[in-house]
Amino acid sequence: MSTDVLILNTAVTDLRRPDFEFADELVGKGGLAKCRTEDMPDYSQQQLAEWIEQGFATAGGPGNTAPLIARTGLKVAVGVNLGRGDYDGLDAQGRFFHDVLTANGIDMSQTYIHPDLHTGTTFIHSTIGQDRGGIAYFPGANDDYDFEIFKGAVERLRPRMVYYMYSGLSDRGDANGGRDLAEFIKWCRGNGAVTIVDSHTLTGNPHALIEQGVAVKEYRLLEPLLPEVDLFFTSCDEARLIENTLAPGRKWIEFGEHENNVHFLDFLTERFWRKDGRTKLFGVTVSDGAYEQHVNPDETVDGPNRIESRFMAGEVVDLVGAGDSFRAGLITYVTSHLDEFKAGSIDFTEAVQMGNLFASMFIKAPLEDRYGNIHAYDKMLKVVRSDVTYQSFDELQDALS
């Protein structure tokens, strides 16, 4: 039996502690940055394992998506690099990441154990109140992601959907100006998979960069990639950074948010759609839903369409920070209706609403039960297809129980 969804790259263990002030010093308060692996603090494996045991760790990257998709009933595998170590063959971070995903029904058979580099690790300075702490990401083994190794995973598992996380966070994965990743995605399509890639460039102050029109070099990696992918959704802030890099000149502050999102999707479609007879779906996530624009195999274009979430439930304030879980819902829907997607007859609004539902449910989940709000696909679909506007989160949870 083939795998439904194969998620690739960026295995990372996220560690959150109030005494990680060094993260602020590295990346600034509230900043996010990919740091050099050699600059990672020299904590012992025993210390990292102790923090993990004490509950200060969560599984990031595919840990934000794979368990959510699997809980709906789809068969999910993950292909990642993990560091070698003394915890049943893995380092402490890798053993934690591996065990979390395995415990949630994920096929981890396509793990590559890197002999020299540690598992990706993020240190997050947890703070109280409105001040955000720094987030310092050390890629470790993720930087040496070899597509030739993971072509074997695609050939063995024959996935219906391939999801690569993330463009912009792996030195080897992003090599050759992004053309290596673009060729790999094209190869995956040639092997029968529908493809989605997420970009993730860690910048400390996106709003200042947007206003200044600054180009972010990592977004140039999307130039060869976007014609090859079948689905691509980004946040409203990243959308502006992407266009500032690939087609500078727009004065974003002179227009409203709706006009900017419509403009960006028109730009993406015009620039990156190819007349090759396949469905393409581009989108932008916003605080209360998402915009989508799609091109059907017959070359008809629909959108941009604004799809407001029906699952804010009076309590979810902002969906923008839930991009991974949104994509998990979108992927779940598209994979469950893959023939319709390929034919261009899928209900694109329902697909986006499934993403909205996943995002709301994930945002409200406690850290100790991050995946517990996601249920079997038929229950999730029933809620998506209902006409109910839920007045409270409890009411929404009851509808899914």
Question: Model segments located where?
Answer:
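Conserved beta-alpha-beta core of the PfkB/ribokinase-like small-molecule kinase fold
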Residues: 161-263, 288-291
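Conserved phosphate-binding/catalytic loop of the ribokinase/pfkB sugar-kinase fold
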Residues: 78, 109-114, 122-171
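Cofactor-binding loop segments of dinucleotide-utilizing enzymes, especially the Rossmann-like FAD-
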Residues: 10, 80-84, 113, 126-128, ...
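Conserved phosphate-binding/catalytic region of the ribokinase-like
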Residues: 1-11, 17, 186-190, 206, ...
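A glycine-rich helix N-cap at a beta->alpha junction
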Residues: 97-117
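Hydrophobic beta-strand scaffold residues
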Residues: 76, 108, 195-196
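Glycine-rich phosphate/adenosyl-contacting loop at the front of the ribokinase-like
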Residues: 1-79, 96-99, 103, 316-319, ...
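Active-site-proximal loop->helix
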Residues: 86-104, 124-126
